[in-house]
Amino acid sequence: MTLEADKQTHGFQTEVKQLLQLMIHSLYSNKEIFLRELISNAADAADKLRFEALSAPALLEEDPNLRIRVEFDKQAHTITIDDNGIGMSRDEAIAHLGTIAKSGTADFLKTLSGDQRKDANLIGQFGVGFYSAFIVADHVDVYSRRAGLTAAEGVHWSSKGEGNFEVATIDKPQRGTRVVLHLKENEQHFAEGWTLRSTLKKYSDHIGLPIEMVKEEHHGKEEEKDAPKEAEWEAVNKASALWTRPKNDIKDEEYQEFYKHISHDMTNPLAWSHNKVEGKLEYTSLLYVPTRAPFDLYHRNAAKGLKLYVQRVFIMDQAEQFLPLYLRFIKGVVDSADLSLNVSREILQSGPVVDSMKAALSKRALDMLEKLAKDAPEDYKTFWKNFGQVLKEGPAEDYSNREKVASLLRFASTYDTSGDPSVALADYIARMKEGQDKLYYLTGESYAQIKDSPYLEVFRKKGIEVLLLVDRIDEWLMNYLHEFDGKSFVDIARGDLDLGNLDSEADKKAQEEIAKTKEALASRIKATLGEDVAEVRVSHRLTDSPAVLAIGEGDLGLQMRQLLEASGQKVPETKPVFEFNPSHPLIEKLDAEQDMDRFADLSHILFDQAALAAGDSLKDPANYVRRLNKLLLELSA
């Protein structure tokens, strides 16, 4: 492997340069994670070889027993990780070790603050794989040959992490990849047998193939110690796939480390569910709920889905057919005994086996979230902060689990003045007033914008709780979530508000009588506002404000209009209903006004104020200001 040909120097991709600088100057408290990352890469390489060898057994050459070997040299201050997995060609080494193809990289780099300790945590969230070698090494050599290529087509990749790397063609008889770390002066303590063994046990005990180190002999006689002896390798891990072991034999720490292995996320998961199904279908699943959202959660082409194994043989990453899109944040493994080893993504698109597994895994994931919400409410708050908007896609996508998904949703409400989205629908129902049979809600841009909205006035007066829906997809969500626990949802800004049994018969009769006495005023206002409004009527929503704009029953609300505008779609024109409070002093003054110009100015001012109170923008702000200034001048005269 010493003869090199066709040596070239390449520059790292810009994002890699930035990551390398962070690695080189890293303030990681647990620098030993470099070993976990490199072992994880080696295990992935073995999985890929197993899969490709299903259709091309010759790729195994004469070395079918896959393993990872870890060596160290105290004198040379090196650590070597050697695998006999799939290996890399020259082009693959340049592509895989010189660039980052992971979506969301640019977003990730933008979040870096320059504070090295904070950035170290962010790097851990992102997962840097191979580049973590530079946490402890100032020079890294990689020797590799892809399975199926000749011995003369090996590649040597070398870098000091200083902006460029060298590649050369070498002879490499053995298939696979050998990574040699030349340790920094202050990191040479890692080149110790006990340190490496304990680190491997801590982070990589779950890896499903042997991780071997040279057996360390403890001799009692000097002559035995001096006698030359061929190295004897021994496995330092359990070397069995974690999900195949009985649940009772697996420690929490092992579950956590396995999650980090499959997700490349350095934070512990919030929850996990390990389940073996036997009977008509046979499969094992191990599902995890992450603590943090990945940077590419909202990227349409981002990697998602479970790792798929068939009878313990790795088939593919990101098998997205086993969970609906709204559960795309779930990480994990599914190992089936009912799918064939030559299964493809196309075959997975449909079929009774996949459909049945998808339904069961979806239910298991939702059960896991339900248990998290019940047993660890603070952890569920963390989950909701990171993944709540994604879960809100569920009622539209998964009709069969609509009620279950709805029970997991959280909203702000008038019950909790903190504005935190902490109210479950079941909690709301438990607090409903006697005679209340509807779930009332209001949508808006933010909690601050709607917490004192005029739409809430009658509900505050009667002590009725209202859900405050302030995520940008909430109005869209409510198009699919019509009821919960047999009770209908009502948008309090929409249509002619009917409080049902919450209003007494006397109240309803009084409202009808007042509306009749104000019919003439309603007609005058409608004639003045003209095409700006669909209707003018007396309001039953208001106690303190003079007027409010109600949304027509079939019309789009502000959130939906903004969503459509943002996506470049045509927004249908809608006209609000102008409702006025007959007992408000301004309305009484308006009713008594005989000067038509002043009546028109005041009517338009009230209309524009109602639009602003609803969170909308004014079509003609200049005219609003002109009218308001004119009125103020008259009042101050």
Curated annotation (Swiss-Prot):
Subcellular location: Cytoplasm
Record flagged with keyword Cytoplasm: yes
Family: Belongs to the heat shock protein 90 family.
Function of the molecule: Molecular chaperone. Has ATPase activity.
Keyword terms: ATP-binding, Chaperone, Cytoplasm, Nucleotide-binding, Stress response
Gene expressing this chain: htpG
Stated name of the protein: Chaperone protein HtpG
Lineage: Bacteria, Pseudomonadati, Pseudomonadota, Gammaproteobacteria, Lysobacterales
InterPro entries: HATPase_C_sf (IPR036890), Heat_shock_protein_90_CS (IPR019805), HSP90_C (IPR037196), Hsp90_fam (IPR001404), Hsp90_N (IPR020575), Ribosomal_Su5_D2-typ_SF (IPR020568)
SUPFAM superfamilies linked: ATPase domain of HSP90 chaperone/DNA topoisomerase II/histidine kinase, HSP90 C-terminal domain, Ribosomal protein S5 domain 2-like
UniProt organism field: Xylella fastidiosa (strain 9a5c)
Main localization, broad class: cytoplasm
